[in-house]
């Protein structure tokens, strides 16, 4: 009698739920579920999402029954849905859904049933609840038997058995899950797989969101069971909102002897949230771009300065770093990857490395990328191992099988990996990411597992120099503790230094103080700012991506421009500063990256070829040094940067102006000037010796240093008190009086002569260490000024004299002895010194013997022939 009554109650509930699904209304705010069922069938889905708020308005008893007694109300609701589907399904159009099971999922306001893993209590058992958290683990998808059919060869009969346990939503009472292998007479049974029913089954772990965990406490976790169509809907790292039934099961380790039980959540609906806090309900981190957004994107792309607008709008709270922000924008856009028919893969992702002084906002730029990119994973050098970045072989705690555990770079496939403190990573761990950064795969051959995983991600890393602070007097490779094999894999290497500049420091301090004085709108001064965390009680109400399709018309257009803010518009009193809204920038980047695939035209290809050949073959000028080696990867870098710049313009063709913009950024990142310290030691020696030294000579030397190479080729100015003499490069007919006047003027400022064998040699302060090579040669030729002849005649005389000059053996021995002592001094701290510095230091030694420039050249060439030193291009190298 009780079973008949329960059956009647079940049928009555099925009838009421079916009436609810079939009811019609004129209210535009109420969902018509017959249309929703048709959309579900056309999309090939098997789960209808029902708004529990609308069900509460229709019948309060049904809504309360679903929340408080899901075991009794969910199964009749599923049965009612299957009855409605049977009347609407088309066997021709929906042939793939024939004989499939359909389910009902719930969304809406759950009230006090909206909890998190920390607030779950015993009173929530067997209730319908809603949970928010981060997925930390996903198991393999395995089949679970629901109904098995067995055949007995001895009796020629079929045996049938249904299975039900605590992890199933069915209305059957819990039965034994023992799999039969023989009948009651002991005859063996063989399973008929064609008549049996299996269901996909997966378990995941949901962890409490770290920003919601109390201070000083670890986030808590709970196991979630996914069945049938819900499997593989999430991956580790996703922020999700899961609706389901909170169940208690037997103890997993000690059977039924323990009074404590294992609890799980049987999922009913899974809503993907944004991968970052504060982004709202955005499935899988992908933003929902509306038609209005596309119109605004195309309108903005027609602006000539769209690239500058986008780069300026990135991290507006960070002052300066124009080129670095442009490079980060290109990294977010990415190039175009190539997969050739012969199996070759050419990556399209851009890698960036920032090396520089502490407190230069490197980590803040990484955090901005982490919060802006749709998929980004952050890690640190010390906190990451090689297997943690790539993949590790672990043991499954449920089955004991060996399985692969994906690392950070595999999880960030099609995303960005942010690595801070890159220089602190050990060499063994750093080698593990070589393959990822170029081939973009992870090859594993461990514990009997041999496989290759995709890791198509961009890498942006920050590192500190070897000495803690960047030494501008040393070459870049002496400051960066990374091998060339690693540096060549980074497309751009930026050296960020903390330069001392009064104007820049004042602007920076004003910018930082504005940030500290910033007060959110609606907050009274003096009150603490508390994070509301945007708690979402209406589950799935704003998500239209595969979960709720009823509110598509209610989408709000994303604003394009940022409203005026004293924080973001700092230092913009006189010039109008335009900033784009960061949410609109996210949509613009997502649209350009997914929709635009530019191609190279012939003119751009030739221009890029010329740039690459020029970078490879041109000599470095003056004190310039390369930050990273120039290899064939540099050519691919130019192509990737040009393609990304074309994407920023939403152009389908990479034009020459894109290549010019890429060249500008690459040259900024590639070349670094090395400043050699001024040698003041010899000046002090001359002062101690009692010789006069005019301080105005420092000013004249400084002025000469600041002059550009082009100006020094055409004009050189020498200041001495009130006298200024200008010598043009094409002056060939100066008078002898003017030459004598120049000589006397220089004598009055320089202070000392050293008489050689053929002409008068001036002793100049060392300024050539900071001059470019071409300027150094010009300046050195200016030192040999003959007081009795013109410049042109002096040059010809010096050339003829150099060819006939000879050096006695005694004088050669003195020169070699003096040079041997100099090679051990500070002059050769860089393993080389210019000819002028060497000659000046040799002649400054207190002795009667002096050397002219021509004699020094003859002596150096003879020592070079004896392999004692190397002399080339007026530079002496120590061996």
Swiss-Prot record:
Residues 690-713 have a biased composition (Acidic residues). Residues 732-752 have a biased composition (Low complexity). ATP binds at residues 356-363. InterPro entries: AAA+_ATPase, MCM, Mcm3, MCM_CS, MCM_dom, MCM_lid, MCM_N, MCM_OB. It is found in: Nucleus. GO terms for molecular function: ATP binding; ATP hydrolysis activity; DNA replication origin binding; helicase activity; single-stranded DNA binding. Residues 754-778 have a biased composition (Polar residues). Residues 306-513 form the MCM domain. SMART domains: AAA, MCM. Residues 679-778 are annotated as: Disordered. Its main location: nucleus. GO terms for cellular component: chromatin; cytosol; DNA replication preinitiation complex; MCM complex; nuclear pre-replicative complex; nuclear replication fork; nucleus. Keywords: ATP-binding, DNA replication, DNA-binding, Helicase, Hydrolase, Nucleotide-binding, Nucleus. Its EC number is 3.6.4.12. Coiled coil: none annotated. A motif (Arginine finger) lies at residues 488-491. Component of the mcm2-7 complex. The complex forms a toroidal hexameric ring with the proposed subunit order mcm2-mcm6-mcm4-mcm7-mcm3-mcm5. The heterodimers of mcm4/mcm6 and mcm3/mcm5 interact with mcm2 and mcm7. Belongs to the MCM family. This is DNA replication licensing factor mcm3. It comes from Schizosaccharomyces pombe (strain 972 / ATCC 24843) (Fission yeast). The gene is mcm3.
């Amino acid at each position: 009698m009780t079973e008949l009554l329960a059956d009647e109650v079940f049928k009555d509930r099925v009838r009421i739920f079916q009436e609810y699904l079939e009811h019609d209304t004129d209210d535009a705010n109420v969902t018509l579920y017959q249309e929703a069922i048709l959309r579900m069938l056309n999309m090939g889905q098997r789960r209808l999402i029902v708004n529990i708020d609308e069900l509460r308005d229709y019948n309060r008893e049904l809504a309360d029954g679903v929340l408080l007694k899901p075991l009794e109300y969910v199964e009749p609701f599923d049965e009612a849905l299957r009855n409605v589907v049977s009347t609407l399904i088309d066997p021709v159009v929906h042939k793939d859904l024939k004989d499939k099971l359909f389910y009902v999922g719930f969304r809406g306001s759950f009230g006090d049933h909206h909890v998190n893993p920390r607030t779950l209590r015993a009173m929530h058992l067997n209730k319908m609840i809603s949970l928010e958290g981060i997925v930390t683990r996903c198991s393999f998808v395995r089949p679970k038997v629901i109904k098995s059919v067995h055949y007995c060869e001895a009796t020629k009969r079929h045996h049938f058995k249904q299975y039900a346990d605590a992890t199933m939503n069915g209305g059957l009472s819990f039965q034994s899950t023992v799999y039969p292998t023989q009948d009651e007479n002991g005859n063996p049974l063989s399973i008929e797989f064609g008549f049996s029913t299996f269901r996909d089954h997966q378990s995941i772990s949901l962890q409490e969101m770290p920003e919601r965990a109390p201070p000083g406490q670890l986030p808590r976790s709970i196991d979630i069971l996914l069945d049938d169509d819900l499997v593989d809907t999430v991956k580790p790292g996703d922020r999700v909102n899961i609706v389901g039934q909170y169940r208690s099961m037997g103890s997993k380790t000690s059977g039924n002897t323990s009074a404590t039980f294992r609890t799980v959540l049987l999922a009913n609906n899974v809503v993907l949230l944004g991968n970052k806090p504060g982004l709202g309900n955005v499935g899988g981190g992908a933003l929902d771009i509306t038609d209005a957004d596309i119109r605004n994107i195309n309108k903005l792309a027609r602006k000539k300065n769209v690239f500058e607008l986008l780069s300026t709008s990135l991290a507006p709270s960070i002052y300066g770093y124009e080129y670095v922000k442009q490079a980060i924008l290109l990294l977010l856009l990415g190039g175009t990857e190539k997969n050739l028919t012969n199996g070759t893969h050419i990556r399209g992702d851009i890698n960036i490395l920032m090396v520089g002084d502490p407190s230069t906002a490197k980590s803040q730029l990484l955090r901005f990328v982490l919060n802006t990119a749709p998929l980004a994973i952050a890690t640190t050098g010390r906190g990451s191992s090689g297997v943690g970045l790539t993949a590790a072989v672990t043991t499954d705690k449920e089955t004991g099988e060996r399985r692969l555990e994906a690392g950070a770079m595999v999880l960030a496939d099609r995303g960005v990996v942010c690595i801070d403190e890159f220089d602190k990573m050990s060499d063994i761990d750093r080698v593990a990411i070589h393959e990822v950064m170029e081939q973009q795969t992870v090859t594993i051959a461990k514990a009997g597992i041999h496989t290759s995983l995709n890791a198509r991600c961009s890498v942006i890393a920050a590192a500190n120099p070897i000495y803690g602070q960047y030494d501008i007097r040393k070459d870049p490779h002496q400051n960066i503790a990374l091998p060339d094999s690693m540096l060549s894999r980074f497309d751009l290497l930026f050296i960020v230094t903390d330069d001392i500049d009064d104007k820049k420091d004042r602007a920076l301090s004003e910018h930082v103080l504005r940030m500290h004085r910033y007060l959110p709108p609606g907050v009274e001064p003096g009150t603490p700012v508390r994070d509301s965390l945007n708690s979402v009680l209406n589950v799935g109400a704003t998500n239209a991506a595969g979960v709720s399709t009823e509110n598509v018309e209610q989408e709000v257009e994303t604003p394009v421009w940022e409203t005026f803010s004293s924080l973001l518009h700092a230092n913009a009193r006189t010039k109008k500063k335009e900033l784009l809204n960061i949410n609109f920038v996210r949509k613009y980047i997502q649209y350009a990256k997914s929709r635009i695939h530019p191609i190279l035209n012939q003119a751009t290809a030739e221009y890029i070829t010329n740039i690459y050949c020029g970078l490879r073959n041109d000599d470095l000028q003056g004190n310039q040094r390369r930050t990273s080696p120039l290899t064939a990867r540099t050519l691919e870098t130019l192509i990737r940067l040009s393609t990304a710049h074309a994407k920023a313009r939403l152009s389908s063709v990479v034009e020459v102006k894109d290549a010019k913009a890429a060249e500008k950024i690459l040259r900024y990142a590639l070349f670094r000037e090395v400043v050699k310290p001024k040698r003041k030691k010899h000046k002090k020696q001359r002062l101690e010796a009692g010789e006069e030294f005019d301080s105005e000579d420092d000013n004249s030397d400084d002025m000469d240093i600041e002059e550009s190479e082009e100006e020094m080729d055409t004009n050189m100015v020498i200041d001495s008190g009130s006298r200024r003499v200008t010598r043009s490069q094409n002056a060939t007919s100066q008078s002898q009086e003017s030459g004598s006047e120049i000589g006397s003027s220089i004598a009055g400022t320089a202070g000392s002569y050293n008489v050689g064998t053929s002409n008068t040699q001036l002793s100049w302060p060392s300024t050539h260490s900071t001059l470019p090579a071409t300027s150094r040669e010009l300046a050195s030729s200016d030192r040999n000024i003959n007081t009795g002849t013109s410049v042109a005649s002096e040059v010809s005389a010096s050339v003829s004299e150099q060819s006939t000059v000879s050096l006695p053996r005694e004088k050669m021995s003195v020169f070699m002895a003096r040079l041997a002592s100099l090679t051990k001094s500070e002059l050769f701290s860089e393993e080389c010194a210019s000819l002028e510095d060497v000659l000046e230091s040799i002649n400054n030694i207190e002795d009667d013997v002096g050397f002219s420039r021509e004699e020094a050249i003859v002596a150096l060439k003879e020592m070079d022939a004896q392999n004692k030193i190397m002399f080339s291009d007026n530079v002496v190298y120590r061996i």
